[in-house]
């Protein structure tokens, strides 16, 4: 049985100082992604590609450890991130795990705005065969929402600080 669940978050960050330089800052893809995600969990895989180890979590006493290859590009002033490939450690051999990530971030007249969609489809693990599908999907939705909220919180705290550091470094 295939389980599917997703979560979505929007972001609006007010930036008052040097906001005219936000578009240039977003061109620093590696730096921006490092500020948005935990840079210690990012491994560069080439230009515009990183492998990211998502913070592990427990679901029904199972340790879950997603690893995602992420493509990053700045297109028309919008920083876009998407999942290229993903693996799931912690549930034994799962061949049909599919993670969808679509996120964007752009400079606006108020500061930075963006949104992220995170989705998963996976077959029901044998260890969870007795748990009803609705409960598993509801739990999955909550977990994904928690991941996105954690990233959103980090972005709200870290991204503006990193932007101001970047401005200082570039004597803006």
Protein language model regions, located:
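Hydrophobic-ligand binding "helix-grip"
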Residues: 64-111
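Residue-level recognition of well-ordered beta-strand positions that form the cores
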Residues: 8-14, 53, 69-73, 100-106, ...
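Intrinsically disordered, low-complexity acidic/polar segments
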Residues: 20, 61, 79, 90, ...
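Hydrophobic ligand-binding cavity/cleft-lining segments
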Residues: 1-60
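A general secondary-structure signal for short beta-strands and their flanking turns/coil
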Residues: 2-8, 47, 65, 96-98, ...
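Generic short beta-strand segments
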Residues: 48-57, 82-87, 117-121
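Beta-strand/loop substructures that line and gate deep hydrophobic ligand-binding cavities in soluble
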Residues: 91-141
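A conserved amphipathic terminal alpha-helix motif
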Residues: 129-172
